[in-house]
């Protein structure tokens, strides 16, 4: 047997040993992890989520106007699919849509949109496809907007089905300041 061939076989044997050790280690780690249960950090501010009825849980995090609309459509589809596929009622699911960052403004009611809608920056709002202008109502709360990312699913519809909303306080504070400045008011008054 030549030295080149012996050298190759020696390296091959060492490689197999290393691979076997690595494989055995990963199996041991996987076995150890399989026995433990993941526990997320708990905060008092999140206790309200444990009070929601429903064993099938889903959280959708929306950060843009389009993703907020998509979250409405997806949440509605989630409930429908659970009913059709598993015979579950809407009350069997606990679904939360989080409106944060640029999606936050879509958690605001029509009174806010009527007063401040034209001042909401384009990055946080969608022009009304019917008027081609800044909206003075929450487009996702109104019917007749089937071409938006919500595909016609509205906030009142998902609320009626038991969907819950969480709204980013940091973004709301930011927008209150921005809207107050644009309209010559005070951020605290806008925030209320």
Place the predicted regions along the sequence by residue.
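N-terminal secretory signal peptides and thylakoid transit peptides that target proteins
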Residues: 1-16
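Loop/turn elements at helix/coil->beta-strand transitions in domains of secreted/extracellular proteins
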Residues: 55, 91-95, 160-164
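Histidine-anchored nucleotide/phosphate-binding helix
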Residues: 70-88
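Acidic helix-start/capping segments at beta-turn-to-alpha-helix junctions
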Residues: 88-112
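A charged helix-plus-loop insertion that forms the helical arch/lid used to bind
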Residues: 111-141
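A cross-taxonomic marker for long C-terminal extensions/tails that follow the last structured domain
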Residues: 130-192
């Amino acid at each position: 047997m030549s030295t080149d061939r012996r050298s190759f076989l020696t390296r091959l044997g060492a490689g197999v040993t290393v691979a076997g050790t690595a494989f055995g280690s990963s199996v041991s780690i996987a076995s150890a992890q399989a026995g433990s249960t993941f526990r997320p950090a708990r905060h008092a501010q999140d206790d309200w989520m444990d009070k929601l009825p429903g064993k099938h849980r889903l959280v959708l995090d929306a950060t843009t106007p389009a993703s907020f609309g998509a979250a409405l459509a997806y949440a509605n589809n989630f409930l429908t699919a659970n009913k059709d596929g598993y015979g579950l009622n809407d009350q069997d699911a606990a679904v939360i849509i989080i409106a944060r960052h640029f999606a936050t403004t879509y958690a605001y009611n029509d009174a806010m949109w009527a007063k401040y809608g034209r001042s909401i920056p384009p990055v946080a709002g969608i022009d009304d496809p019917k008027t081609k202008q800044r909206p003075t109502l929450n487009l996702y709360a109104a019917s007749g907007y089937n071409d938006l990312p919500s595909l016609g699913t509205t906030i009142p519809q998902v609320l009626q089905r038991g969907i819950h909303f969480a709204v980013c306080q940091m973004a709301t504070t930011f927008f209150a300041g921005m809207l107050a400045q644009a309209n010559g008011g005070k951020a605290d008054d806008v925030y209320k």
